Amino acid sequence: MKAVVLAVAVLFLTGSQARHFWQQDEPPQSSWDRVKDFATVYVDAVKDTGRDYVSQFETSALGKQLNLNLLENWDTLGSSVGRLQEQLGPVTQEFWDNLEKDTDWLRQEMNKDLEDVKTKVQPYLDQFQSKWQEEVARYRQKVEPLGAELREGARQKLQELQEKLAPVGEDLRDRMRQHVDTLRTKLAPYSDKMRDRLAERLAQLKDSATLAEYHTKATEHLKTFSEKAKPALEDLRQGVMPMLESFRVRLMSMIDEASKKLSAQ
């Protein structure tokens, strides 16, 4: 189970590099940058959405009657959450940095495997692209005379043109399917080979001392994280409790007033 967890982490760490390797797009972000970007977007969305709901409730009849000053409390809560993120951020970043360092050898081996597979597969991809371009050119040659015929003829020939185009399109579709099937057949052994190499790397990882070291470091990290999180969480709790207590007091007051009115009737 530990090997699976670490393997998933390694694949996550190497994921952007592999994508950049195949697509040759912009340089990949680090894993920690991706985590921070995702977390920032998610937390900001939650805070903005939550503040909208709080604002809507506070402007409602019930909200005005309760007079809870929810927006002010919400902003205070947001500040507490921000401080919590600032305090815990360095601890989490240190964990990711250590994980990347500890698994660097495995990522390098995986990148070598990808490079090897890409080198062997590239000729088949080039051949497929060439076949595709040939089929498109062949299709264009067949269609161009029909287009000229349509321009020269009247509208009544449109149906005839469609009938002539149908078999040409079907022929192109069938030929392209054959090329795709051929490519899939040629690439299958390399897919199996890559899967076997991954299994071999994971087996090496399982038998190495890195896994035990990682488990120890992860345990130490969680302990440190817990110790540093306690004061931040207490600060967060102190920010939330006044809001909850104010809500409870005002709600109980409303219930008492409603009970008195019912008793007086």
From Swiss-Prot:
**What are the boundaries of the signal sequence?**
1-18
In its record, the post-translational modification comment is: Glycosylated.
A GO cellular component annotation here is: low-density lipoprotein particle
Highest taxon listed in the record's lineage: Eukaryota
Identify a single GO molecular function assigned to this protein.
enzyme binding
Region annotated 10 X approximate tandem repeats, chain positions: 68-265
The UniProt keyword set, sorted, is: Cholesterol metabolism, Glycoprotein, HDL, Lipid metabolism, Lipid transport, Lipoprotein, Oxidation, Palmitate, Phosphoprotein, Repeat, Secreted, Signal, Steroid metabolism, Sterol metabolism, Transport
Location comes to:
Secreted
The PTM Methionine sulfoxide maps to M110, M194, M241, M243
Q: Which GO terms describe its biological process?
A: adrenal gland development; amyloid-beta formation; blood vessel endothelial cell migration; cellular response to lipoprotein particle stimulus; cholesterol biosynthetic process; cholesterol efflux; cholesterol homeostasis; cholesterol import
Q: Where does it primarily localize?
A: secreted
Quaternary structure note: Homodimer. Interacts with APOA1BP and CLU. Component of a sperm activating protein complex (SPAP), consisting of APOA1, an immunoglobulin heavy chain, an immunoglobulin light chain and albumin. Interacts with NDRG1. Interacts with SCGB3A2. Interacts with NAXE and YJEFN3.
| Family membership noted in the UniProt record | Belongs to the apolipoprotein A1/A4/E family.
Q: What does this protein do?
A: Participates in the reverse transport of cholesterol from tissues to the liver for excretion by promoting cholesterol efflux from tissues and by acting as a cofactor for the lecithin cholesterol acyltransferase (LCAT). As part of the SPAP complex, activates spermatozoa motility.
This protein is called Apolipoprotein A-I
High-level lineage: Eukaryota, Metazoa, Chordata, Craniata, Vertebrata
